[in-house]
Amino acid sequence: MLQKIDPKTLTMNPFTLIGDQWLLITAGTPEHCNTMTASWGGVGVMWAEPSATCYIRPQRYTKEFVDNNDYFTLCFFDESYRKALNLCGSTSGRDVDKIKECGFTVQAGAGNAPYFAEA
């Protein structure tokens, strides 16, 4: 279940979390979405608000979903999901239903943005 977390209470190292453990960027709706693995980006503060910065190449299928929706999610997983994260980073959602292949359970978050129950 999705829980709202005050970013100021986070104790994990963002360099390890993003750079070593990776994350999934997901956008669309719970019924029709796409996801991609990322191992780059950043977190910080912009205009006194917590923020995350994501960089997505224009040719990525996920970028179409991010551009066409108001919300997207960033999901982090433990090491047992490394194989799934590899799949999501090495195949295109145009060709493969990555979410089905990984066995992820899609949930609706803020703004109906899709996220994964397993994260």
Regions inferred by a protein language model and the residue ranges of each:
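Active-site-proximal mixed secondary-structure blocks
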Residues: 1-119
